[in-house]
C-alpha cells in the first residue's frame, strides 16, 4: 500500500508536468504494450493512468499495439536477405521482397505516430522478448536509420519522442547495489 501511495503521488506530479508539454506537439500516439499479464501488470496499469491523464483535456489519437496479440514476422532467411539487399543496394528476390513488405507495413505504422508510449516490464533483468522482436522489426536500414562511410550512422526519424514506463519487481536504481543487474533501462 505504501509503495502504491508514493507511486500515485509521484505519477501525479509527472503527469501534470508532461501534460503541459504534450498538447502542442502531438496528436497521434502509438502505445506499445509489452506485458502479457494485462490487468495484473504494473507497467500496463500505470500506462493506462498516464494515457487517461494526458488525454483528459486533449484529443489524442491513441493506437495500442499489444505485442502478445500482434503478428510479428520471423527474421528468417528471406527477411535477412532482404535486409542485406537494402544495405548493399542490390536487388532482392520476389520472396525476399514479400518478406520485406511486412517490415515496411509495421514500420509505417510505427513511423506514423507523433509520440510513442512504451509500457515495459522487467523480465529476467531485461525486456520481454516480444518487445525486442518488435524493436528489431522497426529498426531497419533505409527506414529508421542510414549509414554512410562519411557520416556513419544517422537516425531518419527526427522530431519524435517517447515516454517509457518501466516496472520491475525490485529496485535497481543508483545506490541500490543492484545497478549492474538492470538491463531493462539501458537497453531501451
Language model features: what each stretch is:
Residues 102-106, 129-130, 136-188:
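FMN-binding flavodoxin-like domain, especially the glycine-rich phosphate-binding loop
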Residues 8-12, 21-129, 133, 140:
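N-terminal beta1-alpha1-beta2 submodule of the flavodoxin-like/Rossmannoid cofactor-binding fold
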Amino acid at each position: 500500500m505504501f509503495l502504491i501511495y508514493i507511486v500515485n503521488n509521484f505519477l501525479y506530479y509527472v503527469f501534470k508536468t508532461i501534460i503541459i508539454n504534450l498538447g502542442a506537439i502531438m496528436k497521434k500516439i502509438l502505445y506499445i504494450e509489452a506485458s502479457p499479464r494485462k490487468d495484473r501488470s504494473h507497467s500496463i496499469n500505470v500506462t493506462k493512468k498516464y494515457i487517461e491523464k494526458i488525454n483528459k483535456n486533449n484529443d489524442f489519437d491513441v493506437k495500442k499495439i499489444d505485442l502478445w496479440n500482434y503478428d510479428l514476422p520471423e527474421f528468417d532467411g528471406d527477411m535477412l536477405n532482404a535486409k542485406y539487399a537494402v544495405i548493399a543496394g542490390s536487388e532482392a528476390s520476389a520472396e525476399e521482397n514479400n518478406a520485406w513488405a511486412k517490415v515496411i507495413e509495421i514500420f509505417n505504422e510505427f513511423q506514423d505516430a507523433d509520440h510513442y508510449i512504451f509500457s515495459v516490464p522487467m523480465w529476467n533483468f531485461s525486456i520481454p522478448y516480444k518487445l525486442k522482436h518488435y524493436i528489431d522489426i522497426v529498426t531497419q536500414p533505409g527506414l529508421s536509420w542510414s549509414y554512410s562511410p562519411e557520416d556513419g550512422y544517422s537516425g531518419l526519424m527526427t522530431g519524435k519522442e517517447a515516454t517509457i514506463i518501466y516496472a520491475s519487481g525490485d529496485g535497481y536504481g543508483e545506490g541500490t547495489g543492484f545497478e549492474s543487474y538492470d538491463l531493462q533501462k539501458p537497453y531501451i
